[in-house]
């Protein structure tokens, strides 16, 4: 029987469960695979209009994949896996600009291209947040800067005027002095790929639930795991002791 394939999703829970041995304690025979740091971030440099939904179309390999709940719903309805409805998560996110940017308020983003992941949480959450300030024709989105870590690099390099970030890149931008103009926190759903044993799925999420409790109690013990998914070239700049817990799993039905 094939091993249960686990890929972390830029969050802490999978790393904590791995460190504490929770997956093995639940009886999972699994393989743990990381793809962002391993590719130097290139996996997120997908080009224009290639985001979470397109990655589902291409075929993600892990048995459990995560994306914003909008994208997971659409992917499942189009035959790209199925949605797991016993858990969801909430990811703090925001639109960041340089410290010296003339953009001070959300209204100042009128006509400014905001870098987001195409058909991803950052895409929909940006529109949702800015609708309170701007007319539809004033909201400008840039899909060409790629997915999460690729967008982060554009912000740091000064080649993108405004970027939507979440998870580790969110905290890294804060640490480096970039300003958050508006919050864009969004929900994340879970997609099941292939036909994993239902008991393996239950074991996997039981392990993550234990990890979530650990993070809730002492997040500062685990924020160093963000480094495991950052390209090595950023490590010397990172002070993860200042970072927060990020995405939080909610073990309630998604309806």
What is the role of each PLM region?
Residues 1-136, 161-167, 180-181:
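Short, glycine-/small- and polar/acidic-enriched structural segments
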Residues 12, 89-99, 174-212, 245:
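Periplasmic-binding protein-like
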Residues 198-255:
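Secondary-structure end/capping motifs
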